[in-house]
């Protein structure tokens, strides 16, 4: 027989022999195979999982190996089998920053040996040969593992030799302490490693927060006087009493005068019209400056302190757009795309036009890299002032590589900074913004109104890829969006949307005036009449018909129920009425389980039979659950799976019930 010389570089047999015997699949949480980090928050249990299997009946061992960015020291967690080849571990997440993990798996000879020994011992089979095999396995481990392994194995070998009976030796081999020792020192045959996957750890505020937006210039209480930061400070107790965590301002910078907009977006401003705060920049300064009528740096610092004293944080608007008066046009004309006649094209976001705004050109020859660095420095400058939350205006109209770079630059130095994406655009772009680093995002929730589309949207956000890269912030309105539903639904409609937002996601927001049920619209448009973007709008926040108390109660319910502090865990349940959305949110251990029923009809009472999710507690259909109405504190016991409800929207268009086992 002639011998064949094989080239190991391209021989299929050699390549096959070198392939891993163990398969690692379906690793989670993973975004695009590790191209982008999955999202999580500090000080929580993060489930790391994978499907791991091999041929035959070999017993496998597996671990998660993880490290923090910038560290070389690795930490290990054992993965435990869940069934159907899935393995998982719970990692208590570290403080903010990037971490990396991989999965390692191997054939665990000692675990296989102990399993076989236990089975044969239980069947009362002769074990002399098996015990000799165990001794040889331990000896090989000591000989091949080096001095430290040999030293660790020696006490076990001595104890086995000292055993006086087969039963004693079997008991020692099967002892839990022996199993733990062998897990640590045993050979890891056919060891295979997954690639390394990134996870971005952010503050809990990135997942759970209630945002309140106001224009500080309207807080004077006088339609003829521009508001100040001190006026906002006087308002803080009211906002904090409603349970908000974040106070968010539109841009607070100087406003241009060229092409300044008048009331209701008029192309002509009258004397005294303040203009749109999004037309940033004048002779008083640009993105780094404060509008002089709001106050100065010292006033701003005093505001930041007051906001924190009321248990909130301040978020600023980062809008990359300039008025024609912005200092950058004089200082850096090469950052802009000039037309042949020497003019600049005004900004557009169809169908909207912004004649008072011009845009920078990110890829202009003179803008690379100085414009990018200047914008980064704007953000870092406000971080140095104490701002760690930024709502970013229309990020989908700026380059994705810019955002990925800027967010990494900022969070690399200040990992506590949170970025909210205000992008109402195509789903792929919204998801991609989350992947490149935005902590959270505005959503399509604003336009989801009927039962099917709400249930489908909430469920979609719980599934990949959204689940791991996108945190939805359910804003019920914005200065730009006066939703059709609110324009024609009256006070009950505002309560409906508040309930859906607060119960549907850990993140929700509202623009001031929502608590007063403001809905006057420009005819035929989803915009506010007398928009605050173009004029001062002082309000009576205690006006009759307000929903301040209900908002405060909803926010309190969120704080008291961990299941409601995330958009994850949504599960729709049966309620046999197309105008009632009925769903549940729960923690993994069922310690907190909240049911929510929302009447989607703001005008008519609705009734429905509905199912108590007894099966979620492992209970039969005739079992009972304790119920507690979280809006009024009433308690009772429900008996049986099918129940009945009636919701009258003029009283309260929703019900929120915490349920638990009767024997809990």
From Swiss-Prot:
What residues bind alpha-maltose 1-phosphate, as annotated?
A: 261, 321, 356, 394, 533-534
Per the UniProt entry, the Enzyme Commission number(s) are 2.4.99.16
Coiled-coil spans are: none
Q: Which UniProt keywords apply?
A: Carbohydrate metabolism, Glycosyltransferase, Transferase
Query: Which residues carry the site feature described as Transition state stabilizer?
Result: 480
Could you state a single Gene Ontology molecular function term? Answer: hexosyltransferase activity
| SMART domains registered for this protein in UniProt | Aamy
Top EC class for this record: transferase
Q: Which GO terms describe its biological process?
A: alpha-glucan biosynthetic process; oligosaccharide catabolic process
What is annotated as the active site? Answer: 393 (nucleophile), 422 (proton donor)
Does the record bear tRNA processing in its keywords? Answer: no
Which SUPFAM superfamilies does the annotation name? (Trans)glycosidases
Please name the CDD domains in this protein's record: AmyAc_GlgE_like (cd11344)
Top-rank lineage group of the source organism: Bacteria
Q: Which InterPro entries match?
A: GlgE, GLGE_C, GlgE_dom_N/S, Glyco_hydro_13_cat_dom, Glyco_hydro_b, Glycoside_hydrolase_SF, Ig-like_fold
Reactions listed under catalytic activity: alpha-maltose 1-phosphate + [(1->4)-alpha-D-glucosyl](n) = [(1->4)-alpha-D-glucosyl](n+2) + phosphate
Q: Does the keyword Endoplasmic reticulum apply?
A: no
In the record, the note on similarity to other proteins reads: Belongs to the glycosyl hydrolase 13 family. GlgE subfamily.
Q: What does this protein do?
A: Maltosyltransferase that uses maltose 1-phosphate (M1P) as the sugar donor to elongate linear or branched alpha-(1->4)-glucans. Is involved in a branched alpha-glucan biosynthetic pathway from trehalose, together with TreS, Mak and GlgB.
Q: How does it assemble?
A: Homodimer.
* Protein name in the entry: Alpha-1,4-glucan:maltose-1-phosphate maltosyltransferase
The source organism is Pseudomonas aeruginosa (strain ATCC 15692 / DSM 22644 / CIP 104116 / JCM 14847 / LMG 12228 / 1C / PRS 101 / PAO1)
